[in-house]
């Protein structure tokens, strides 16, 4: 939003979102916290709320009649809204920024995305080639995680730390994954008594939640970027955190817990279109960091890989070289700025004032 406003100072905004969007001048019709239902069971329990959110969005679109609709992630909701907008506001431009990960699974969605949008603005450098295979267009605009790391480095000192060497543990952002992952991650790290252990706390999860697993000598921190940037190595729950860890230059092993690991293997082979799981590896197209998933997420396997990360300097340097290649592939251009320029440039001949939903 701020990037669009920088390009078009007369732009006005309305939508579904949170405090940050409201502070940037957006008229909020529904707070995103009333929409965050994770998993099939949660959606079933909240079907009436889900439908109410659709109704709110539909009525707001008809009331606002914006020039542009910008969709961000959340495909099950946004694709339905896009279909409604196409039917009722056919002149409106629709852009998908941070599109669904169709390159990983639910590949069939790519046809619906192409049919319902005027442009797809991807955040991974391999996405344009993937869309091209199906005869569609996707523009890579840059990566928001790269932008965040760059801004953090500009404001932070990375001249090293006077603290003793330590292992960073990033157990995830949700309580369920923290409770499943943290105990095994701690056990693996404890096998290296020459290194201290520090744990990253997730936003919205109280310190007291971690207390049942953390010894008194293992501190909890909410400054995750600083924790990772100065760590000697890290154990990271798979997700965006693996990419953040790579861009911060910390050797890592990635883990992922599943409740039914054998069933996960069948699901992976049947539905998942990528043979790699973590973002750094997917971006590179090969395994730069070891992925300890499902049956392979054991204390022994994690500790074995951690030993190499801590003690094998040549191995560490190869990983850091791969990290540099990831940064090169992601590029330096800010994703929001590029996306804003494309959006405004494509509609500024239609209206003097941009109304964005």
For the regions a language model picked out, list residue spans one by one.
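Nucleotide-activated sugar donor-binding and catalytic core shared by glycosyltransferases
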Residues: 1-357
